[in-house]
């Protein structure tokens, strides 16, 4: 959804005396950052909470590229629609997540979640096991103690190349 569309919905709600939206769910990860152009600044300026889904890019940011397909990738045809083709820039970013995770002694998922939190959003995570819950808690706790420095964030973001906007309904 474009920011102007979301604003239109807010206007309709206000004009009719309805409750306005207090949060926005949209796709956002190190591999898809198009919402940084309009939606995230709009939400931040109007006090709307941002709770993006798929911050681990359907599992791509949880393991070295090509090491194995996730269960979700094998069974979820929506995943292909959402992610599109994996680009060389995506592969480089995944490699950087892997490198930083190794340096800091944490999982790749922890790095990806910490990046989201550092960007001022609180992501929705699909946690299918106790290990995933523990990794997430660790990531959030370590984020508060400075897991990612500003240079780390720049390192993770540096290779990103803009993509066509994905419309999610």
Sequence positions of predicted segments:
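Hydrophobic packing residues within well-ordered alpha-helices of enzyme cores
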Residues: 6-9, 43, 133-136
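Aromatic-lined glycan-binding groove of carbohydrate-active enzymes
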Residues: 35-73, 107
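Conserved short secondary-structure transition element at the edge of the structured enzyme core
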Residues: 55, 83-143
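Structural preference for beta-strand elements that scaffold enzyme active sites
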Residues: 19-25, 49-51, 122-124
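Glycine-rich beta-alpha junction loops
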Residues: 2, 28-32, 54-61, 115, ...
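Conserved, mostly hydrophobic/aromatic
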Residues: 24, 43, 50-53, 97, ...
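Short helix-capping segments at alpha-helix termini
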Residues: 14-20, 105, 145-148
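Glycine/proline-rich, positively charged
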Residues: 1-34, 38
């Amino acid at each position: 959804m474009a920011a102007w569309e979301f604003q239109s919905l807010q206007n309709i709600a206000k004009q009719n005396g309805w409750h306005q939206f207090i949060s926005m769910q949209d796709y956002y990860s190190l591999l898809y950052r198009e919402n940084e152009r309009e939606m995230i600044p709009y939400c931040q300026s109007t006090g709307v909470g941002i709770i993006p889904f798929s911050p681990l890019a359907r599992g791509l940011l949880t393991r070295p590229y090509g090491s194995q397909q996730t269960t979700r990738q094998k069974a979820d045809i929506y995943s292909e629609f959402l992610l599109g083709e994996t680009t060389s820039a995506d592969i480089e970013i995944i490699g950087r997540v892997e490198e930083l995770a190794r340096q800091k002694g944490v999982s790749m998922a922890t790095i990806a979640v910490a990046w989201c939190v550092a960007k001022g959003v609180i992501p929705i995570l699909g946690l299918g096991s106790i290990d995933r819950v523990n990794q997430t808690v660790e990531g959030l706790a370590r984020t508060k103690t400075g897991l990612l420095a500003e240079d780390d964030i720049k390192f993770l973001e540096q290779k990103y190349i803009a993509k066509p906007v994905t419309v999610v309904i």
